[in-house]
Amino acid sequence: MSWQTYVDEQLVGTGQLDGAIIIGLDGNSWASKNLTLKAGEGQAIAALFKTPANVFASGITINGIKYMGIKGDSRSIYGKKGATGVATVITGQCILIGYYNEKQQPGNAALVVEKLADYLIENGY
């Protein structure tokens, strides 16, 4: 399965996310749908996973929008802005980023991203 297929079917295709992107550990985009990163944001997200607790002080910025950090550990970083938010999860080779809008449930959105991360980790990614 291609990275784009994971984004299209396993993330956005679930209806629980409005947009998603998969980036490498270097911060470069591998696949995306309805979500983009501005210059340097991918690298900043990758760096944030080295000290994830910093998300509580600095937040997480995606597509120029700063989200307040609500979870930050070595696996997952979540951010929220109003009724919208993002869930990011790191695997051995990539970082999954899912965006949910005000009509979608944060818990369901995060679960979709976490489940795909589990699958990728189990399969060596």
UniProtKB/Swiss-Prot annotation:
CDD domains named among the record's database cross-references: PROF
GO cellular component: cell cortex; cytoskeleton
SUPFAM superfamilies per UniProt: Profilin (actin-binding protein) (SSF55770)
UniProt keyword annotations, A-Z: Acetylation, Actin-binding, Cytoplasm, Cytoskeleton
Pfam families per record: Profilin (PF00235)
A GO molecular function held by the record: actin monomer binding
InterPro entries found in the cross-reference section: PFN (IPR048278), PFN_euk (IPR005455), PFN_sf (IPR036140), Profilin_CS (IPR027310)
Predominant cellular place of this UniProt entry's protein: cytoplasm
Subunit and partners: Occurs in many kinds of cells as a complex with monomeric actin in a 1:1 ratio.
Name of the protein in question: Profilin-P
Organism: Physarum polycephalum
